[in-house]
Regions:
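Post-HExxH zinc-binding segment in Zn-dependent metallohydrolases
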Residues: 110-144
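Active-site recognition of the HExxH zinc-binding catalytic motif
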Residues: 93-109, 117
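Short acidic, glycine/proline-enriched loop segments that cap or flank alpha-helices
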Residues: 26, 87-91, 108-109
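Active-site scaffold of zinc-dependent metalloenzymes
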Residues: 55-92
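Acidic, metal/ion-handling microdomains and their immediate structural contexts
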Residues: 9, 105, 109, 123
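Structured N-terminal alpha/beta-domain signature
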Residues: 41, 68-69, 101-102
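A metal-dependent hydrolase signature that marks the N-terminal structural subdomain at the beginning
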Residues: 1-65
Length: 144
């Protein structure tokens, strides 16, 4: 008899996979993920599926948005740019947290959720999802 998987099963599987990728990042480049480690993570195709670069440029952001991953072309193989608000260029620890959150878009595309992003980022940093979420809220509050 075939097992019928639900949408919830799919979401849980995606979140677990994102968390495992975050844990791999921490194992390989941690335990402290700083700016240099982030740049190495972005080059590592076992962790980040497609080429990815970071640009401190608000042109790719919506009003009030801290960061956003945008495809460089029609095909994922053309890579992605993670736009981070220039305000955070002088705050590497914040920029790292913002970039990690965006990596689920690079790895999973539009299927990724905020829960997936929090799972990956918190696992990479070795903190709880609540602590990661709270830190992102504090970072975002700096733009207001």
């Amino acid at each position: 008899m075939a097992i019928q998987l639900t949408e919830q099963d799919g979401r849980q599987s995606m979140e677990a996979h994102a968390a495992s990728k975050g844990a791999e990042m921490r194992d390989k480049y941690g335990p402290d993920i700083g700016w240099g480690q982030l740049l190495n993570i972005l080059k590592d195709r076992t962790l980040v599926r497609y080429p990815c670069e970071v640009a401190f440029d608000a042109a790719g952001l919506l009003e009030g948005e801290c960061a956003h991953a945008q495809p460089n072309g029609d095909q994922p193989d053309e890579g992605f740019t993670i736009f981070i608000h220039p305000f955070f260029a002088a705050q590497p620890p914040h920029a790292v947290r913002l970039a990690l959150y965006q990596l689920v878009v690079v790895n999973y595309g539009p299927f990724a959720s905020s829960d997936d992003a929090e799972a990956l980022g918190s696992a990479a940093l070795g903190i709880s999802t609540e602590e990661y979420y709270d830190s992102l809220c504090q970072i975002a509050d700096q733009l207001t």
